[in-house]
């Protein structure tokens, strides 16, 4: 009935609850089918054990019931997060408005990608909406709790949460969140096998991006599932994964320095426009510098919605260049019927044609990152068309 990606958090929670050696491949082959009724993950489990704490209550249910509840939670967080975000601008907003926007978000391509696989991406998107609202209302305890949860669940998508807290000078909150998340991972490894579990986990991670798998860094590989990171982009352009990784690392360092400097320059001018632009930059940068698949694009919906609401509402006036550069990403997130387009391209042009679609993902994210960087530069120079100042966070 559903895709099998929910197997990963469920089995991690089950193993943490019962003290099972989740990273032992033989144990996976023998026990995962018995517990879930599904086959074992073909390429192992790549989530750290601390993830199991974030979904621990679900392990008390059977796999089928937990899966249904998980899907309901994904939908609820998308709807509640969207509602909270829309109401940031008008507490008296008519119910029909936020309901219509939430409906469009649920129908968007990126949310469908996550829902199809029962991935956590829709949950992260909803949590990011709630996080931004908490920051807007100076509810830093709640914001820090959300950031801590995301760090425990999937630290690779936590940069927008951590970055916004740092931009607001909440260094202590970030330190506490990172410490708690780190302790959760240590406790998780201790619970599922200690040093042996850590060794098995690191061996599995080493093979995460194996050529010929869905996680391959080569977008021209027929087995490839679309990825978003610079390693994927550079490998597609150059053809050598190792060089692609090196170029990705260099690009990551340079962009990180530039973004850090820009955020520091804007630390006393964090109105909603600046915050939304920083959020877009952090979201794009976070998914470009680390391995991610296409469904993780849904987090970019948050900043794009914020900027779109302000632009369409006449609060800010985004330049044409910004709209052009973010247009491809917005179109893919909103409309792209990925499986259908992949099927058409494969039938017409073969794997090579499908490869062009794969490589379009990191290109579109990079263009949106460039757009956000240019907007940050305009904000830094205070050379931007804007209506009366927005309320500060």
Question: PLM features: residue spans?
Answer:
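Long, hydrophobic, well-ordered secondary-structure blocks that form the structural core
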Residues: 78, 149-166
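Aromatic-enriched
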Residues: 308-393
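Primarily membrane-embedded glycan-assembly and transfer machineries that use lipid-linked glycans
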Residues: 1-143, 165-297, 301, 388-393
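Membrane-embedded alpha-helical segments of transport systems
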Residues: 152-155, 183-187, 330-335
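Hydrophobic alpha-helix-in-membranes signature
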Residues: 47-48, 56, 121, 154, ...
């Amino acid at each position: 009935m559903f895709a099998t990606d929910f197997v990963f958090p469920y089995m991690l929670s089950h193993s943490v609850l019962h003290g099972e050696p989740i990273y032992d491949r033989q144990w996976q082959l023998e026990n995962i089918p018995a517990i879930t009724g599904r086959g074992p993950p073909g390429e192992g489990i790549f989530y750290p054990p601390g993830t199991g704490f974030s979904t621990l209550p679900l392990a008390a249910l059977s796999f089928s019931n937990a899966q249904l509840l998980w899907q309901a939670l994904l939908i609820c967080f998308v709807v509640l997060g969207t509602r909270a975000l829309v109401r940031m601008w008008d507490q008296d907003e008519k119910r029909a408005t936020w309901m219509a926007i939430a409906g469009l978000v649920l129908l968007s391509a990126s949310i469908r990608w996550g829902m199809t696989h029962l991935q956590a991406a829709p949950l992260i998107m909803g949590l990011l909406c709630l996080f931004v609202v908490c920051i807007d209302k100076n509810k830093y305890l709640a914001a820090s709790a959300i950031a801590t949860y995301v760090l425990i669940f999937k630290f690779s998508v936590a940069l927008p949460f951590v970055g916004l807290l740092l931009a607001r000078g909440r260094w202590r909150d970030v330190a506490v969140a990172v410490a708690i998340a780190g302790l959760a991972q240590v406790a998780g490894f201790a619970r599922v096998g200690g040093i042996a579990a850590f060794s098995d986990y690191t061996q599995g991670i080493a093979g995460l991006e194996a050529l010929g798998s869905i996680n391959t860094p080569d977008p021209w590989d027929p087995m490839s599932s679309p990825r978003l990171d610079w390693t994927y982009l550079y490998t597609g352009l150059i053809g050598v994964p190792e060089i692609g990784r090196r170029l990705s690392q260099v690009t990551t360092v340079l962009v990180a320095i530039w973004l850090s400097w820009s955020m520091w320059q804007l630390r006393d001018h964090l109105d909603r426009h600046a915050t939304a632009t920083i959020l877009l930059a952090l979201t794009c940068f976070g998914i470009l510098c680390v391995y991610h698949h296409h469904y993780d694009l849904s987090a970019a919906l948050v900043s794009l919605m914020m900027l779109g609401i302000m632009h369409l509402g006449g609060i800010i006036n985004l330049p044409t260049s910004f709209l052009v550069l973010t247009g491809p990403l917005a179109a893919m997130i909103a409309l792209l019927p990925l499986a259908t387009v992949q099927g058409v391209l494969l039938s017409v042009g073969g794997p090579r044609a499908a490869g062009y679609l794969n490589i379009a993902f990191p290109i579109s994210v990079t263009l949106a990152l460039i757009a956000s960087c240019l907007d940050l530069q305009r904000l830094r120079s205070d050379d931007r068309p804007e209506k009366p100042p927005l309320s500060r966070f």
